[in-house]
Amino acid sequence: MTNLKTSMIDTMTEKIVIGQKHTSELTVTNAVTAIAMGSGDMPVLATPAMMALMENAAMLAIAEALPEGCTSVGGHIESSHLRPSKIGDKISAIAEVTKIDGKKVEFKVAAYSGETLLGEGTHLRFIVDKERFMSKLG
């Protein structure tokens, strides 16, 4: 049974490689400000919005490498928000695979406005079978 389980996990991650990257982008609008998201009272990019963009980049970095019926879910994110961004700024989040351990995939993530680093951190995703994952919700 253990060998079958290991084989299934290996199949889930066999096409994911260290260094695999994706960049996700957004323009700061009122909808993603700290005011709108309830994380602050300033009209600047909300930290949760920056982290969501980083998570999106990580998810998309490996999405096409996953077998049919599988997806990845976020398990942990740690980040520092270093600089503010105003409405109208164009933000890019880059996620790069740094480690693969069974069904766990770790990423280095960073967000930029042009060449300016806005935030950086790490993110962990788990590869799951969609149907099995949803069945656990009861």
Stretch-by-stretch model annotation:
Residues 1-11:
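N-terminal amphipathic/basic-hydrophobic helices that include classical n-h-c signal peptides
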Residues 11-45:
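Catalytic strand-loop segment that frames the active site of acyl-thioester-processing enzymes
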Residues 15-23, 100-107, 113-136:
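C-terminal binding/interaction regions
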Residues 28-30, 83, 127-129:
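Non-catalytic surface loops within mature trypsin-like serine protease
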Residues 46-50:
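A short mixed-secondary-structure module that forms the rim of ligand-binding clefts
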Residues 59-92:
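Hydrophobic beta-strand-centered segment that forms part of the acyl-chain substrate-binding groove
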Residues 79-114:
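Hydrophobic beta-sheet segments that form the core/acyl-binding groove
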